[in-house]
Amino acid sequence: MVFDYESEWASEHTATPTQKVHHVDEPLQWFRALADHGVTADVVPVRGAWDDYEMVVLPSVYLLSEETTRRVRDYVVGGGRLVVTYYTGISDEKDHVWLGGYPGSIRDVVGVRVEEFMPMGDDFPGVPDCLGLSNGAVAHDIADVIGSVDGSATVLETFKDDPWTGMDGAPAIVTNTFGEGRSVYVGARLGRDGIAKSLPEIFESLGMAETGENDSRVLRVEREGADGSRFVFSFNRTHEAVQIPVEGKIVVSSFAEVSGENVSIKPNGVIVTKQ
């Protein structure tokens, strides 16, 4: 999961299509939706070392420099799996808008060309409050008007709403082959629930397992110390007690009760074990 403070600052200026959408919100929605499928994502700065991950998400990364563009292209060409959302690649690092449509310098990587945006909500008379998708997800606040889809790309989901919106049947989620890798473009703000609903098809199109190895009720994070010791943090994500097996020696616990080889973690509870 790529995060970029400069993209957050850029997305806050008043020249954007809507003031309801900022970069900082989108990584959190994707992180939570992935966790709902048992996948714990690492959050890495845009200049960090994300090139070796099996899958990378660019969630509304508003600014794409030429250097980041090169890294993205090399990553996918080399076999990486990339997910890109709306509001990505609008401008370069100096906030100069990329010409020719969006997502700017990586249009061919994702196989789409976005020509304009549809902001939504009661701040904009004559536009819908939301848009439905063919998979049952609902888009809020903003949707991309995808003007063209490359021949190498396949539309996974379309918008499905009243014809007067002008978006009924338009592409919403598109997958593309680029080099040895694949990409998925998500052209709307779907929120946690809509992302979670769309992830099985996204995973399948990228050739990945639909769920991760972790219990979706528990956020599991591993950290390794300088001496090689490994610590596992297990957080209860639900409003009910969750029972999990004890891994290693419990060194810290909060709102948790051990019973034999299992531990019951109450809501807001956490345990830390040393392996």
Can you name each region flagged by the protein language model?
Residues 1-275:
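Carbohydrate-binding surfaces of carbohydrate-active enzymes
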